[in-house]
Amino acid sequence: MAMTYVISKYLDEKTAINVRNIAANLEDQRWIRRNELTPPRQVENSTCAYDFCGHSQMPKHAVDFLKNIAPKFEEHRLAEIAINRYNIGDYLGKHKDFDHYRKNLVISLQDSDNGVYIHDDDTFVKDVIGQGVCIDGIGPVHSVAPVNRKRYSLVYLYE
């Protein structure tokens, strides 16, 4: 099975800033700390340390806004929305995505030297506000190295 992904601009800067502001203003109790990766996502005993806020933890106005701006893909239905928050030093080790989602779109909400490393292609995708990596299926092995400043990413999962 071919592992494919597309790097493209998915949100304009103003919209991405609005999403980042929503994320930055979420109360601490809405965030879930993730400290482990487990098979089948985990690759080579990798670990993680970052905060996750799924749509079930978000206020309704945030979910409605994020659904409204979600990119549309023919033959794919939006199934889940999440925001990942990385504080300085946080990371997401080598992993593949779950196989029950057909597309996994991760959009950067800031410009920075941080980003996503795609191991299979030895490619680093630097954070560019509004730019995303859209992975088909489980996709290639990828990770986020320890970040040097606060980082937010918007995640859309499609069935």
Pin down the residues of each PLM region.
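Catalytic core of Fe(II)/2-oxoglutarate
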Residues: 100, 107, 111-159
